[in-house]
Regions:
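An N-terminal assembly and electron-transfer interface module characteristic of large anaerobic redox
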Residues: 1-174
Length: 174
């Protein structure tokens, strides 16, 4: 975000997402509270955000029709008017790109597992949150694990290889 501000971005769009994409992998699909509302934290703690218009609407990404309507209202009120048809097309393109990205992540996870098994390497799954890549709060655990000879993979890169576990507790987050 600081980089965007330094580059003179007029608008920064960082929505709040109470629910993450429903992957049907758990009892519910609540987003981690920190991830869901990280933009609220940034708004309250980054004075530099006053240099741009920081947009952080609450969005339901699991209903594209409602998402488009909500974005239309929000954009009309805060940025300018956009045709609903354009917003729907942008949402569809965004989800298509997300699917392509996730297919690449899964392929890389499979490639890493194959490499580790073929070369007798230990495998470490780093289960984290998106904000862990923030250099201001990252701890370098991935680099430490690699320096110790582990092949590291993210949970997103291999979760498709396992069946969901049904347990006797309510699994809130996926």
């Amino acid at each position: 975000i600081e980089s965007l501000i330094e580059q003179g971005a007029e608008y920064i769009f960082y929505p709040c997402l109470t629910y993450i994409i429903n992957e049907k992998a758990g009892d519910n699909h609540y987003n981690c509270p920190i991830v869901a509302y990280y933009s609220e934290l940034l708004q309250a703690n980054m004075p530099s955000l006053k240099k741009a218009k920081f947009l952080y609407p609450y969005i339901n990404i699991n209903n594209r029709r409602e998402m488009a309507k909500g974005l239309k209202r929000f954009l009309d009120d805060n940025v300018g008017s956009f045709p609903l048809k354009e917003i729907r097309r942008a949402i569809d393109r965004g989800f298509n790109e997300y699917e392509k990205y996730m297919a690449g992540v899964r392929a890389e996870g499979e490639r890493a597992l194959k490499f580790a098994r073929e070369n007798g390497k230990r495998i470490m799954i780093l289960a984290g949150r998106p904000y862990h890549i923030d250099p201001e709060i990252g701890h370098g655990i991935d680099r430490l694990a690699c320096s110790l000879g582990f092949v590291t993979v993210s949970e997103d890169s291999i979760c498709h290889l396992a069946e969901p576990q049904f347990v006797h507790v309510l699994n809130q987050w996926t």
